[in-house]
């Protein structure tokens, strides 16, 4: 964190008394420059801080005793003084005997010490300024202790009453009593855009919040001082604080969040923060921004604390106000700030901190979430919320929708009247009922959620509702969030509800509430919960409190000792009850007491007389003209209460679905439960849907019957005499057709309705269920169409078809003849009575009650007698194969394949047969054959790798035809060349895209590009790694020039004079040097015939390496390169330098890549032997300093990009790239420095170019964390702002070439690393995944690279010349 934003505050033992609270101390910290006068450098400091310059803009506040003038200043006669009065007197903390005197006692006292708060005005200034500066804000005075000019404002404690707000107070001047006043040196408003005060008026800013505003100032000294430079007369000022109830938006959480209290002047006008309004009264106000809980007051705190409410001012005489001690604590760690301790403060914040650690780690709490009062949903970011005042109370509640508001009002409405108390089914308490459950045609009343959950668990009921917010889950798949609590599965609508349920369930208050509920239930009915009760299942005596309740078959609650006992008893009872008889009305399994025979021959059973009476009443209501009609067997299911019924249903059409209900009550409850809300057509309010009526073919929704009637009146008034009611579809519409039938004129909405009505009237219309013609008694409106049915039976069948289509009920015109015949016969039998169902009459039989025939099933068990008897086919039933060798070709007669005949089956078995082959040889070489054989045997090496390679080479040698050679020695020497040609000719897959390099024996890279500083002494050389060498800064060197054109490779030797002229030229990268060096090394090994002197050379020659690099396998190339880096010599026989060997290996790698060879000799695990040998050689490299001060090396950065050693195409290449950039730009040239690097210390930063004003991203790293204790060796490789600042290393974004941008590489590295490692402070370089591919989302593991691997990487990076050029460039730039 930038230190410029941190202020300090030094506290004394009187600080709590002076400040009154933390808010008073902190709210004055950022005060100053609010009025248009120039900033005054008026800072009072202790003697040790005098004559010290302040370069930053920190808010530094010191509190110390200041000797006031000997006499108090008189008041101006024409000014109105206003004093700041607290509601309670404050007491000194501890054993301090000083008591705050009253204002009357303060007036005559002189010579005492007063406390002064000096606040920095947030401007860069010198404390020893001595020139006079005019101040228009406050009266100046010069204390004797300091030379600085200090402005003081008096907040004196005096007698103040509501009736004397506008009256002047004669004794409100500066007092001389200790601890009696707070004096402010300079005041600055917290708003940057506040206009200045002129002519005694303060202009409030529009749309902005100001934490402190001062509109009128009265002089604290005598009138001889005169007015300010801007014409504003200095005046006394004070505070008139009024309590204000915050708005609903600010009341999100008690005591948390910003709150701007209202501002009121003396005249009573209220101003909110940010509103623009003139001040009509010269008496002004001060408003302080703080957080206040709504309708709450914190006990014991009456100061202007940001966490306490503003109490109403009770103005009492100061002699009755005791002083109250207040502690100032750290806002982060809550530790009290001691006397003399330095406090830190952030600009614009009222919080104090004990240290910079607490200041940086402190963060404001997030804005609290707003929840819907009804469903508890998070509505913090939801738009369109509803704020309503419920139950005529002063509090406002916030809801997510109108449905929640309606449900909340319905929930609160029973509380207005008398409580409907009933006895709970579970606990038996006579209390208010919260739940009613209809189960098995009985309503069970439950008093609480606990009893409701126990009821659900006992009866196995599952509710599709969220356990937290109660939201309806339409299906089981909707509640995928399941939480198992105490063996029970609780379903939730979303993961946030699961989290809230866990937090509420784990809260101690929740657990205490459950325990208190259980304890209260036990205490209220001890005789019930303490007695022993017999379990219904196992008949065991248990306490009633531990019993599990369940509804039995008789509809009453039965106790069980456990859930297992309850389930076993239900299973047993279900088996015995399966043969029982079900009551036709209440559907209970009980012994029938009454039977009724219907006219159609059906017999119904009833359990008691009440069921018979209810059944008769229901049947008579549905019978036309009082005639009894037998109820139908078709049962509909109510969509709300889930009960079965056989009467005409109530229909609700909503969202292209038709819902059926058994009654109007269920329909209304369903609408409320599922929030079926729409805009009423009449009142234009969003309310629960009552009914939808068609008007002129358009559906109009209404919220009540009254709105529907009123809309009908308005509709009829608009149409006048043309408004009619259609006799067919019953809608109110404009007259469309008229028809006279039997002398009655009927009106219709259209010709179609008129035609359909005539068909119905003349009985020509068909039933929409059974498709039969005749009298259609029932009609309903289904999906906007009128449906007619024969009777209620067809109506119920039609509704069943809509729920579960049954093809047997779909009768088409093909049954017309049968239907007419049935109809005719029924008409003759019953006369004018309506025809019953077309189902045939059922055969009637007598039934005996309580008589059950005893039946027994007798079966004959026939067991066959088994006997085993051998036969011909039983023996040797498995086929046995016998090999019979038969020479081929030969004819083998095969008999006919019978079931008992074995036949031979030919099988081919290859057998190797040694065949001697004789090769001709010249007569002159026959004597050398034994010696050659012995020589070949001696070539066998003890090294397993050499033996394997020798075997492979011998196999290739046999294919090349060594017998055609003139002698054995020439065969051994020329085998490599012949094998290379054969391999290139026989393998068409390996096609070189790069031209072959001709062999040049005198080509030498160190001659073509010599080191220009070889004549320098060894003292100019230094050992690597040079960790921040200070010797570079002590001797400034000229800036390195731009690299010139690259010179071409030439043959032969050149003198050092010629090479020194071109020492600054960059070396061209040509792979021909590496390939030519390989060929030179292979030919040298082949021509060396002294095999007995060098054992290692003899073993290598047995591998028979070839000049063509592409003809070797990975193992051969690994072995050859390992020996190549150790044995390669210049054409003159001298050793190559380590950087030259690295250059040659890079050329070999480029040749392999250009020839479509995917091997990477520096990264692949197959070249581990070569990498170890190369690292040993590179460790001995010691760079030399050229005369121009640059470092000499033949390896450059561009070479590594060309051969893909750097880049983001693979995990290892990306890791090498980051390692190279950190070494180049951060100056990390030791392994210890790289190990100090971590994800937490490298961060992205935006840097602005002061010339082009262009922002560029960069990676920043602090030198102090990098160097540790190596301060004496550090150099500023990063840019510094000041010499005394710590240097900062940066890797600036490369916009010219994004593929080589350090910032892009770092972002790619973060994206391919595990996410949980981004802020770790102990790791930066991660181990690559062994099985990861380039398409994998994660390339690295959470394990850091070992030290050995980092050392090998550092050895290669330090040979690159560009890392030293980068250092020299930045050094020269800093010296400019």
Curated annotation (Swiss-Prot):
- What are the Basic and acidic residues biased-composition ranges? 139-152
Q: MF terms per GO, please?
A: ubiquitin conjugating enzyme binding; zinc ion binding
User: Disulphide bridges in this chain?
Assistant: none
Q: Which residues carry this modification: Phosphothreonine?
A: 1375
Q: Give any Gene Ontology cellular component.
A: PML body
Q: Where are the zinc fingers (MYM-type)?
A: 326-362, 368-408, 420-455, 462-501, 532-569, 635-670, 722-757, 763-798
Partners and quaternary state? Can form homodimers. May be a component of a BHC histone deacetylase complex that contains HDAC1, HDAC2, HMG20B/BRAF35, KDM1A, RCOR1/CoREST, PHF21A/BHC80, ZMYM2, ZNF217, ZMYM3, GSE1 and GTF2I. Interacts with FOXP1 and FOXP2.
Q: What is the protein's known function?
A: Involved in the negative regulation of transcription.
The protein, known as: Zinc finger MYM-type protein 2
The species is Mus musculus
Q: Which gene encodes it?
A: Zmym2
């Amino acid at each position: 964190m930038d230190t410029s934003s941190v202020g300090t505050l030094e506290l004394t033992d009187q600080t709590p008394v002076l400040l009154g609270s933390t808010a008073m101390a902190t709210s004055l910290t950022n005060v100053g420059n609010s009025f248009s006068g120039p900033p005054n450098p008026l800072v009072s400091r202790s003697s040790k801080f005098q004559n010290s310059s302040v370069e930053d803009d920190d808010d530094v506040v010191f509190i110390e005793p200041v000797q006031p003038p000997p006499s108090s200043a008189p008041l101006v006669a024409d000014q109105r003084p206003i004093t700041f009065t607290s509601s309670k007197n404050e007491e000194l903390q501890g054993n301090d005997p000083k008591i705050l005197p009253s204002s009357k006692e303060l007036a005559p006292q002189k010579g005492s010490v007063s406390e002064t708060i000096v606040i920095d005005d947030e401007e860069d200034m010198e404390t020893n300024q001595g020139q006079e500066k005019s101040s228009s804000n406050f009266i100046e005075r010069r204390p004797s202790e300091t030379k600085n000019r200090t402005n003081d404002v008096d907040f004196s404690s005096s007698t103040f009453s509501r009736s004397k707000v506008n009256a002047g107070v004669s004794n409100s001047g500066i007092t001389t009593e200790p601890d009696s006043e707070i004096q402010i040196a300079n005041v600055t408003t917290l708003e940057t855009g506040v206009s200045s005060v002129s002519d005694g008026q303060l202009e409030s800013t529009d749309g902005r919040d100001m934490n402190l505003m001062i509109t009128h100032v009265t002089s604290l000294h005598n009138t001889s001082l005169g007015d300010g430079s801007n014409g504003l007369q200095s005046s006394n000022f004070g505070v008139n604080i009024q309590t204000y109830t915050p708005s609903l938006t600010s009341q999100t959480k008690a005591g948390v969040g910003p709150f701007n209290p209202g501002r009121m002047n003396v005249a009573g006008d209220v101003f909110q923060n940010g509103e623009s309004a003139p001040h009509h009264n010269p008496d002004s106000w001060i408003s302080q921004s703080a957080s206040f809980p709504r309708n709450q007051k914190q006990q014991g705190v009456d100061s202007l604390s940001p966490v306490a409410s503003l109490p109403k001012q009770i103005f009492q005489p100061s002699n009755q106000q005791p002083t109250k001690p207040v502690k100032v604590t750290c806002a982060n760690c809550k530790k009290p700030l001691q006397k003399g301790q330095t406090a830190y403060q952030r600009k614009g914040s009222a919080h104090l901190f004990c240290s910079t650690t607490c200041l940086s780690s402190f963060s404001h709490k997030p804005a609290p979430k707003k929840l819907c009062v009804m469903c508890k949903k998070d509505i913090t970011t939801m738009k369109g919320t509803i704020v309503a005042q419920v139950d005529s109370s002063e509090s406002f509640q916030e809801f997510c929708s109108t449905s929640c508001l309606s449900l909340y009002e319905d929930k609160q409405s029973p509380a207005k009247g008398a409580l409907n108390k009933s006895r709970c089914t579970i606990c038996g308490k006579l209390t208010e009922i919260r739940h009613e459950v209809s189960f098995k045609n009985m309503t069970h009343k439950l008093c609480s959620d606990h009893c409701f959950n126990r009821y659900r668990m006992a009866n196995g009921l599952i509710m599709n509702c969220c356990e937290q917010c109660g939201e309806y889950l339409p299906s089981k798949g909707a509640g995928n969030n399941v939480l198992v609590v105490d063996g029970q599965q609780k379903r939730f609508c979303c993961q946030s509800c699961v989290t809230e349920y866990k937090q509420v369930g784990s809260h101690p208050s929740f657990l205490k509430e459950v325990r208190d509920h259980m304890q209260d239930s036990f205490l209220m009915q001890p005789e019930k919960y303490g007695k022993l009760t017999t379990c219904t299942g196992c008949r065991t005596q248990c306490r009633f409190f531990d019993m599990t309740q369940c509804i039995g078959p008789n509809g009453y609650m039965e106790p069980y000792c456990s859930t297992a006992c309850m389930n076993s008893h239900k299973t047993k009872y279900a088996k015995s009850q399966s043969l029982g008889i079900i009551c036709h009305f209440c559907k209970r399994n009980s012994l029938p007491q009454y039977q009724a025979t219907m006219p159609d021959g059906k017999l119904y059973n009833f359990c008691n007389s009440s069921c018979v009476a209810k059944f008769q009443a229901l049947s008579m209501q549905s019978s036309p003209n009082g005639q009894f009609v037998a109820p139908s067997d078709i049962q509909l299911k109510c969509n709300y209460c889930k009960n079965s019924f056989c009467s005409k249903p109530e229909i609700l059409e909503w969202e292209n679905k038709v819902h059926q209900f058994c009654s109007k009550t269920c329909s209304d409850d369903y609408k409320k439960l599922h929030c079926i809300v729409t805009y009423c057509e009449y009142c234009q309010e969003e309310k629960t849907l009552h009914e939808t009526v068609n008007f002129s073919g358009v559906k109009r929704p209404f919220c009540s019957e009254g709105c529907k009637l009123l809309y009908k009146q308005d509709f009829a008034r608009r149409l006048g005499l043309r408004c009619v009611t259609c006799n067919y579809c019953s809608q109110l519409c404009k007259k469309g057709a008229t028809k006279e039938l039997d002398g009655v004129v009927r009106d219709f909405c259209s010709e179609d309705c008129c035609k359909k009505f005539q068909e119905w009237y003349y009985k020509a219309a068909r039933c929409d269920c059974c498709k039969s013609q005749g009298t259609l008694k029932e009609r309903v409106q289904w999906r906007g169409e009128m449906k007619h049915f024969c009777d209620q039976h067809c109506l119920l069948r039609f509704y069943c078809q809509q729920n579960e289509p049954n093809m047997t009920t779909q009768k088409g015109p093909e049954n017309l003849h049968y239907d007419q015949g049935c109809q005719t016969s029924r008409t003759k039998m019953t006369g004018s009575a309506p025809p019953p169902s077309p189902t045939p009459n059922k055969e009637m039989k007598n039934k005996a009650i309580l008589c059950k025939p005893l039946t027994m099933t007798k079966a004959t068990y026939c067991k066959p007698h088994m006997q085993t008897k051998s036969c011909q086919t039983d023996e040797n039933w498995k086929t046995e194969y016998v090999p019979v060798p038969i020479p081929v070709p030969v004819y083998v007669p095969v008999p006919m394949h019978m079931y008992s005949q074995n036949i031979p089956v030919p099988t081919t078995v290859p057998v190797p047969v040694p065949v001697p082959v004789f090769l001709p040889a010249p007569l002159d070489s026959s004597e050398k054959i034994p010696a050659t054989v012995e020589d070949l045997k001696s070539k066998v090496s003890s090294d397993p790798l050499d033996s394997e390679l020798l075997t492979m080479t011998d196999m290739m040698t046999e294919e090349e035809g060594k017998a055609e050679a003139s002698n054995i020695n020439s065969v051994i020497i020329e085998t490599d060349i012949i094998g290379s040609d054969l391999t290139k000719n026989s393998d068409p897959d390996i096609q070189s895209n790069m031209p072959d390099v001709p062999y040049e024996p005198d080509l030498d890279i160190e001659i073509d590009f010599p080191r220009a500083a070889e004549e320098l002494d060894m003292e100019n050389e230094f050992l690597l790694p040079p960790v921040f060498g200070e010797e570079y800064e002590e001797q400034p060197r000229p800036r390195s020039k731009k690299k010139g054109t690259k010179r071409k490779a030439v043959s032969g030797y050149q003198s050092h004079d010629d090479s020194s002229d071109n020492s600054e030229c960059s070396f061209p990268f040509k792979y021909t040097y590496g390939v030519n060096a390989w060929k030179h090394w292979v030919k040298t090994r082949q021509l060396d015939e002294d095999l007995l002197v060098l054992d290692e050379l003899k073993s290598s020659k047995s591998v028979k390496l070839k000049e063509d690099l592409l003809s070797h396998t990975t193992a051969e190339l690994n072995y050859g390169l390992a020996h190549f880096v150790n044995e390669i010599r210049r054409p003159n026989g001298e050793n190559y330098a380590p950087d030259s060997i690295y250059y040659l290996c890079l050329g070999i790698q480029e040749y392999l890549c250009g020839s479509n060879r995917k091997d990477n000799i520096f990264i692949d695990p197959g070249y581990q032997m070569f990498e170890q040998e190369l690292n040993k050689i590179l460790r001995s490299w010691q760079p030399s300093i050229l005369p121009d001060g640059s470092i000499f090396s033949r390896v450059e950065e561009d070479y590594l990009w060309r051969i893909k050693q750097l880049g983001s195409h693979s995990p290892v290449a990306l890791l090498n790239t980051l390692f190279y950039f950190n070494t180049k730009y951060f100056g990390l040239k030791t392994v210890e420095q790289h190990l100090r690097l971590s994800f937490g210390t490298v961060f992205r930063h935006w840097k602005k170019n002061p010339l082009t004003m262009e922002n560029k991203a960069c990676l920043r790293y602090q030198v102090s964390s990098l160097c540790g204790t190596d301060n004496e060796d550090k150099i500023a490789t990063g840019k510094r702002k000041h010499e005394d600042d710590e240097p900062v290393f940066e890797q600036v974004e490369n916009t010219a070439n994004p593929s080589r941008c350090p910032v892009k590489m770092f972002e790619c590295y973060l994206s391919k690393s595990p996410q949980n490692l981004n802020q770790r402070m102990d790791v930066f370089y991660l181990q690559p995944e062994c099985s990861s591919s380039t398409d994998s989302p994660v390339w690295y593991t959470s394990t850091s690279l070992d030290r050995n691997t980092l050392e090998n990487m550092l050895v290669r990076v330090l040979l690159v010349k560009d890392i030293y050029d980068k250092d020299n460039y930045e050094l020269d730039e800093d010296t400019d």
